[in-house]
From Swiss-Prot:
HAMAP family: UvrC. CDD domains: GIY-YIG_UvrC_Cho. Residues 205-240 form the UVR domain. SUPFAM superfamilies: C-terminal UvrC-binding domain of UvrB, GIY-YIG endonuclease, RuvA domain 2-like. The UvrABC repair system catalyzes the recognition and processing of DNA lesions. UvrC both incises the 5' and 3' sides of the lesion. The N-terminal half is responsible for the 3' incision and the C-terminal half is responsible for the 5' incision. It comes from the Bacteria. It is found in: Cytoplasm. It comes from Alkaliphilus oremlandii (strain OhILAs). Belongs to the UvrC family. InterPro entries: DisA/LigA_HHH (IPR041663), GIY-YIG_endonuc (IPR000305), GIY-YIG_endonuc_sf (IPR035901), GIY-YIG_UvrC_Cho (IPR047296), Hlx-hairpin-Hlx_DNA-bd_motif (IPR003583), RuvA_2-like (IPR010994), UVR_dom (IPR001943), UVR_dom_sf (IPR036876). This is UvrABC system protein C. NCBIfam families: PRK00558.1-5 (NF001824), uvrC (TIGR00194). GO terms for molecular function: DNA binding; excinuclease ABC activity. Keywords: Cytoplasm, DNA damage, DNA excision, DNA repair, Excision nuclease, SOS response.
Length: 621
């Protein structure tokens, strides 16, 4: 039994990190403290001065844990890692890192590639980002590939050269320099990668000077073809440099951070200044921050943003000072490798620069808020139209859609997607493996997954009532206002049969397609309803139908791929269950295993040379 008084009494007066847990043993808050004893006790003293958010959090605390650290810096690093890993409900959170893309240069490969990724891992590759503007990221990648035709494939270049394999189409249309031909040296290829890194580091001026020297040397030696290529590269780079605004005469690297608050959310604007030029800007949204002070918001942003950032500048400008500023500077200096200063300018050029970022933060917030409001009004009108079409008593705020996917009855799966207020709610999506139905029977499969979903929901609802829990704490406890199934009258009948067996009365309609497998309309209460194809309602139905189909197909493919991989690897001598699992964990896909060299395979846990050679020989027959 958890004894709160005893645990509070024995808290150490040392720096560390504390984790608050609820009755499900979930971490709902992570914090750091100079003195764990003083900080943690504050939560359980008189709540008069606590803001509503803290009061709500404390009401859910069932137990807490703490980790003692030697220094405040260690506590800060641990806090950042725990917040990133657990994403606690009551911490100020940036959107999940996985949703922000990065540019990745695979410098861990002999012939590196440049990729777009949403995951930063310790694999000796070089990362740039995060980017919140996908359009700007894609434009950057287009420019890079235009100037530097590096490879985009994941083929084994050394093997292609050794076997004299034919290069792909990209080589013939001059979109790839073709390292697989053996006509390009590693030094030449790596020089291109070095130039790309200079470009992404914001050192375009230095890069242009280097290319100008190459152009002059090529012209002197009468290599006019390469001289022309270098000239085109310089023109492309100068076009980018001209777009960059000079904001500081001092050629230094700075990040300038300002914020704007509205309707419980905080909009953060970051200007990235490199060598005195504004090279990029990004904005971020922190939700549900109405009870958090500006200092708390800024501190949380700095910790989370720079935990995932691939570059830390020498100077960071912010609007208000934050608690533990010195510790933050020490942490960032460690990440950068030399001194980093966090400053709050009060006057002069730096204050003017911060004011400019503040204006942009306000403008971005106002524009986005207007768009969100217009979108909300349009969606509300669309849902009202749907309610009128189906003669529903209530506007269907929450819609659940279901689909079955199988190929000749093999690996049948069901999927459930959720839309709330006309927008997909990905965290409520669910997948079901069909357990009781043999062979291709969509009707029986639908009946099974609907029964399982709502039976589980009823059980959770009972637990919530008995234990006085919040409805949101159940995975299936929230029921829809409308069910939309991918299919016609037969599918609708199966769903209604399952609901009837559980004494549930939820409206059900089917989304039907035409002969070309495109959205056609709805079926409801035995009647087929046509919808104007140019209407917002038609677009919403199409969106829901496409999404539930995509989700089902994706799940089905992943299961098939695992089965295929398993069967292929099972046939290779020396590859048992443990090695199959180790290969999958290390490489992630059959394609990557197929393209791996013997040396790369030897990096897999439990692998020996003979088995590695068997794998290469078998997969490349």
């Amino acid at each position: 039994m958890f004894d709160l008084k005893e645990k509070l009494r024995t808290l150490p007066e040392k720096p560390g990190v504390y984790m608050m847990r609820n009755d499900k043993n979930e971490i709902i808050y992570v914090g750091k403290a100079i003195s764990l004893k003083n900080r943690v006790r504050q939560y359980f003293q008189s709540s008069k001065n606590h803001p509503p958010k803290v009061k709500a959090m404390v009401s859910h605390i069932v137990t807490f844990e703490y980790i003692v650290t030697d220094t405040e810096l260690e506590a800060l690093i641990l806090e950042c890692n725990l917040i990133k890993e657990n994403r606690p409900k009551y911490n100020v959170l940036l959107r999940d890192d996985k949703t922000y893309p990065y540019i990745k240069i695979t410098t861990n490969e002999e012939y590196p590639r440049i990729l777009k990724t949403r995951k930063v891992i310790k694999d000796k590759a070089k990362y740039f980002g995060p980017y919140t503007n996908i359009g700007a990221l894609n434009e950057t990648l287009d420019v890079i590939h235009t100037i530097y035709p590096i490879r985009t494939c994941n083929k084994n270049i050394e093997r292609m050269i050794a076997n004299k394999e034919r290069p792909c189409l990209n080589y013939h249309i001059k979109k790839c320099i073709g390292p697989c031909t053996g006509l390009v040296t590693k030094e030449e290829y790596h020089q291109m990668i070095h130039d790309i890194i200079l470009f992404l580091d914001g050192k375009e001026d230095e890069l242009v000077r280097k290319i100008e020297e190459k152009m002059k040397a090529a012209a002197i030696s009468m290599d006019f073809e390469n001289a022309a290529r270098y000239r085109d590269q310089i023109i492309a780079l100068n076009n980018i440099v001209e777009k960059q605004k000079i904001v500081s005469v001092a050629e230094q690297d700075q990040d300038v951070i300002a914020m704007a608050k509205n309707e419980g959310n905080t909009w953060i604007q970051v200007f990235f200044i490199r060598k005195g030029k504004l090279v990029q800007r990004e904005h971020f949204i922190l939700k549900d921050t109405e009870d958090d002070s500006n200092q708390e918001i800024i501190a949380s942003f700095l910790k989370q943003f720079y935990s995932g950032a691939t570059f830390v500048p020498k100077e960071i400008l912010i609007e208000e000072s934050v608690e533990d500023l010195n510790v933050l500077e020490e942490w960032l200096s460690g990440k950068r490798g030399n001194k980093v200063s966090i400053k709050v300018p009060q006057k002069g050029d730096k204050k003017e620069l911060l004011d400019m970022v503040k204006k942009n933060a306000l403008m971005t917030m106002e524009q986005a808020t207007t768009v969100i409001q217009l979108e909300k009004e349009k969606t509300e009108d669309t849902l009202i139209e749907l309610a009128q079409l189906l003669d529903l008593e209530e506007v269907p705020y929450r819609i659940e859609s279901y689909d079955i996917s199988n190929i000749q009855g093999v690996e049948s799966v069901g999927s459930m997607v959720v839309f709330e207020g006309g927008k997909s709610k990905n965290k409520d999506y669910r997948r079901f493996k069909i357990k009781t139905v043999k062979g291709p029977n969509d009707y029986a499969s639908l009946e099974e997954i609907i029964t399982r979903r709502f039976k589980r929901g009823l059980e959770e609802t009972q637990d919530i009532i008995e234990q006085s829990l919040e409805v949101s704490e159940g995975k299936f406890a929230i029921f829809p206002d409308l069910i939309m199934v991918d299919g016609g009258f037969g599918q609708v009948t199966s769903v209604k049969k399952a609901l009837h067996s559980l004494n549930l009365n939820i409206p059900v309609c089917g989304m039907i397609k035409d002969d070309r497998h495109r959205t056609k309309g709805l079926v409801y209460e035995g009647e087929e309803l046509s919808i104007e194809k140019t209407s917002h309602l038609f677009r919403l139905i199409t969106k829901i139908q496409d999404e539930v189909h995509r989700f089902a197909i994706t799940y089905h493919r992943s299961l098939r791929k695992k089965t295929t991989l398993q069967s292929i690897l099972e046939e290779i001598p020396g590859v048992g269950e443990a090695r199959r699992k180790a290969l999958m964990i290390h490489f992630g896909s059959i394609d990557k295993i197929k393209n791996a060299t013997v040396e790369e395979l030897l990096e897999v846990q439990g692998m020996n040379r003979k088995v590695a050679e068997n794998i290469v020989e078998y997969l490349n027959k």
